């Protein structure tokens, strides 16, 4: 029905593009007028636009003229003129939508249109890329255009100082990676002084490779962590225990099947991606750890460590999920195949894998701050994105980010030939067919790019090609350092490249070879340093004679190699262009489309074909049993391909099932994080008020009133007579911490006259008196500074503890689904109570610390920043303006507000 509707009326994207075309006509009509302007007149358009904005015109009013200005400036500065379809893409991005543009259609240039227009407001535009290389390249390259038009450009990459970051964010346009933007937001909400904040308000972001960032990475939260203080011994013991167990692996475990009857100690369910102990395994665990009952809440820690060891051994595969390099376990990105340095699995899984691999088990980290990309990017006032493949995920973009997807027509028609899938009975037959296809292409000089899903498979194919004497390049997580260079040359005559499905994303494969990378390689051979080569091929202005000489050499080499690659290009085109071979269908159709999209860029010829076996994970876990049975009944040879419409439909249906499951997982992550996000917003808003200089005296007095109320409600029974109240509790809770000793010692006559309201007033008056005495002792200015620092430190410490508690709660409530309770509703209810309790604890700690503080003016500290590195060490900063007055127990919280125990903080030398 939908297809019939689209035939008559066109698709949603067709209708949207048609609606935008009148705007494009207006832009194109302005071209002669813009071409007639001098450089100075063209530059003067920027202040003119800003003035018109201030006088009431809108960005939409300015759009046609502003886009025409950018188009002409780009022609003069970069030598590139925006095509009509690129103007359409620019309008879509300005409207806060996702523009799906095929590989090679010039997304980088398209972004300049909405970036310039929105930067005119002076509130900052963020251009988000997937890695530092692309952020640097695009900021330098497109920066020439923006600078020509009078706009400033900043760059956020790893390793910058706070001052450098602040300067970059204050620019009109800021390029950077999703990780850097997210981490800076978290760090800004951990500072003690407002001037240490680096970001401005989140105004407008354009996200490049938007599907990768907002969907593929949506399940992974950004976490700033410090080193925890828990021992790692239990991970080693749990690993030793799991090694003794007998395992049984199921493709899919029938719910009705009694796991108790299985002759194994633990079972792995591949489809559900779980590893669990059987009754036999539980019994062995209790014997090994010397405990009565593994399910007892007291044994939760042991149970957790065993579960992570089971996951490490049963589910996590070396050279697929992670690699071991330089005695470290490094995660492999499941989508790009890249090594993710600095990233660690959470909840102790990383430590369990370290124990499994026999490398040093690092201490578990403590989360200081975290946020998901979903919630970070939803904070922007306007958000848009670009990618080559978004349409298959349109439902998710709409429901979670309120973004619709518009497919932008290509400048030249796509002439790539996408062959139907070749399906084989087993993996051996499939790989033999792949090798035969490569040999056939290689004979005529047609370049081949083979996409694999794991290191193991790429190395297997490599060994098969070696046996047939076919020279080739392998690109996987182990050899990713030269990723861009290897991918760039994948279009050379006769080239054969094996790569993970999404490797080298952002690098164009040019038929005949890439002269830029060839020139760089030659410069390395001639002894040029890497930093000089980067400067020589970059776009920054310079007067450095060494770099100017290097640029001259580079230009000469580039021109020489360009002649060679242009001649070779003709031969590659004659051979059929780049041939893409997929060796397995990915869980997501989008990733398959990305692999296909590497060929046929800008009207180039090309071919693609996927080779599939019934032993592939997707078919094994999600293909229908009826289909598998039918294929078995045919009794085909392993080298005989199966081609049938039913089979193609089954593959697509399997992918749709997995996509739906993964969408449900991401949606579940968001449901839980939305609860946390509301609490995060409250805490961060409170912090910002403090940082912005709000007078805290009223807040502190209000806290004292709340504490007095809490004490009376907690210890005074319903009976109005004081004899029935818990005086021991009242005194131990209140005296020393909030009021001087003896304050609550009443005579018999006073007791007779006492009621709850009078007791509350006595406690409050005593706290207020002590507070006023402190202010006289310190002076108002120092008192306000003390209040500010103490409040921020206590809030940060309690928030960190709350994050841990919420994490534990989230894991715990999931089990309640078995009791027919909605885990999300349970989580919301209990997390609210925990948040209220955290706020009470913040108030009581802040008041207690302030009332018991003595300032030693000779030990006033220098100001320190809170969270410089990604893995921030928390608790060392601004902790010594305060030292104890009363004797503090060594295991009590330090009164300085650091959140550490006294013996590990100010009492460390005692």
UniProtKB/Swiss-Prot annotation:
Topology versus the membrane: Peripheral membrane protein
Cofactor: binding comment: May bind 1 zinc ion per subunit.
Catalytic activity of the protein: ATP + H2O + cellular proteinSide 1 = ADP + phosphate + cellular proteinSide 2
PROSITE patterns registered for this protein in UniProt: SECA, SECA_MOTOR_DEAD
EC number: 7.4.2.8
Protein residues bound to ATP: 86, 104-108, 508
Matches recorded under SUPFAM superfamilies: Helical scaffold and wing domains of SecA, P-loop containing nucleoside triphosphate hydrolases, Pre-protein crosslinking domain of SecA
GO BP annotations, alphabetical order: intracellular protein transmembrane transport; protein import; protein targeting; protein transport by the Sec complex
Keyword vocabulary terms for this entry: ATP-binding, Cell membrane, Cytoplasm, Membrane, Metal-binding, Nucleotide-binding, Protein transport, Translocase, Translocation, Transport, Zinc
GO CC field: cell envelope Sec protein transport complex; cytosol; plasma membrane
Subcellular location: Cell membrane; Cytoplasm
Cofactor requirement: Zn(2+)
Matches recorded under InterPro entries: Helicase_ATP-bd, P-loop_NTPase, SEC_C_motif, SecA, SecA_CS, SecA_DEAD, SecA_motor_DEAD, SecA_preprotein_X-link_dom
Gene Ontology MF terms in the entry: ATP binding; metal ion binding; protein-exporting ATPase activity
Summary of the function given for this chain in its UniProt record: Part of the Sec protein translocase complex. Interacts with the SecYEG preprotein conducting channel. Has a central role in coupling the hydrolysis of ATP to the transfer of proteins into and across the cell membrane, serving as an ATP-driven molecular motor driving the stepwise translocation of polypeptide chains across the membrane.
Subunit comment: Monomer and homodimer. Part of the essential Sec protein translocation apparatus which comprises SecA, SecYEG and auxiliary proteins SecDF. Other proteins may also be involved.
Protein name listed in UniProt: Protein translocase subunit SecA
Biological source species: Acetivibrio thermocellus (strain ATCC 27405 / DSM 1237 / JCM 9322 / NBRC 103400 / NCIMB 10682 / NRRL B-4536 / VPI 7372) (Clostridium thermocellum)
Gene: secA
